From Swiss-Prot:
The active site is at K81 (charge relay system), S156 (charge relay system), S180 (acyl-ester intermediate). It catalyses: L-glutamyl-tRNA(Gln) + L-glutamine + ATP + H2O = L-glutaminyl-tRNA(Gln) + L-glutamate + ADP + phosphate + H(+). GO terms for cellular component: glutamyl-tRNA(Gln) amidotransferase complex. GO terms for molecular function: ATP binding; glutaminyl-tRNA synthase (glutamine-hydrolyzing) activity. PANTHER family: GLUTAMYL-TRNA(GLN) AMIDOTRANSFERASE SUBUNIT A, TRANSAMIDASE. The gene is gatA. Coiled coil: none annotated. It holds the Pfam family Amidase. Keywords: ATP-binding, Ligase, Nucleotide-binding, Protein biosynthesis. This is Glutamyl-tRNA(Gln) amidotransferase subunit A. One of its GO terms (biological process) is translation. It comes from Mycobacterium marinum (strain ATCC BAA-535 / M).
Amino acid sequence: MTDLIRSDAATLAAKIAAKEVSATELTQACLDQIEATDDRYHAFLHIGAHEALSAAAAVDTALAAGERLPSALAGVPLALKDVFTTVDMPTTCGSKILEGWRSPYDATLTLRLRAAGIPILGKTNMDEFAMGSSTENSAYGPTRNPWNLDRVPGGSGGGSAAALAAYQAPLAIGSDTGGSIRQPAALTATVGVKPTYGTVSRYGLVACASSLDQGGPCARTVLDTAMLHQVIAGHDAKDSTSLETEIPDVVGAAKAGASGDLRGVRIGVVKQLRGDGYQPGVLASFEAAVAQLTALGAEVSEVDCPHFDHALAAYYLILPSEVSSNLARFDAMRYGLRIGDDGTHSAEEVMAMTRAAGFGPEVKRRIMIGAYALSAGYYDAYYNQAQKVRTLIARDLDEAYQSVDVLVSPATPTTAFPLGEKVDDPLAMYLFDLCTLPLNLAGHCGMSVPSGLSPDDGLPVGLQIMAPALADDRLYRVGAAYEAARGPLPSAI
């Protein structure tokens, strides 16, 4: 059974299709692993054992009847970040204000997983409303990194990444607002992809910052991630930001990249995303990865993106501004927590008491920053200026892609930091998103693929690969080539 849960998703899918293992057997093995280990990791907030086994049984029944499976990943179970709505499990977004809340509808992404025959094991832990870089802001307690239980797994989607690293699930879904898929992937030696904005539906993704949020696939290999990407991507009429365009062949790109041939591929190293402030072991791992890409035949050059120096400041004005608008819906009137509704308090008092009790410190901080940035007299000085910087960052990237096909950088400035180290230092926590957030501002796509263990502390390091909008296939070609050349890594457990 241990060998079964440690297998990659592509292998498991092939075994299910060949009837060498049943979907029910695999799903039960994952549920057993969760039960045996999650008291240490706290990757999950909710377990949907009955629902997952029912979905797996449906796949087995279809196979027994000789029916065609609905997707290449049918029967392979998955961990779903608790920011996507599900009718059969609570959706809390890691917040007390939504404790126990059940959505009346499934997110489009959830529906696509169900239609593909993918059993959903449960909902994973996250920073409250996806605001954080360590999963310590969850109202239900932090997730621990399987590589070192005293370290964070990254955030906001640390639960999904930890579930993969702990072999609780072969597949996972995250959401990425400023790096919440890629950064946890880097810290747990897993693969995470932020797709091009608008290619994965946001309908049913509880909004943090609507112009930045994007759901995406997570797995332990590049090919597995590509296969999941293919399942969840595509136009959705229910999402006004969804693009009506053909999705690149990411699976074909991953398979082609596995040959290890990168001749003719132009790779740019971003000047602004290395140097001072980066852990020496992270830089050493990055330089080794760049050397490996060069050895595979890629043409590597340095690229200047001057406005990246202002990306962090712009991001932490734009994101809180959108947060202050989006979270206004939690008013204690329609759904979720309600405090003081005993007939002795006004509606305004009930709303204030509910928000005071229901929102955590980081969420309150960002709401206040956003309200200030959008206030009369400060809008032009802060929010409007930040949007101008956002345009310049996108222009930097567009110009860079005139001379290169993809960009690379470290995925994070350091390896996983100790639990509690940055939780009371917002600026230090925000700086941890330095490498990943520029892509969200531009709407482009990016991947974190493991690049080994840091010689400093033996913890995982991630290589970030970036590509233009709608060029997601480039990520998978380069990522798969690098993964094949890098070879296998030790496991967390």
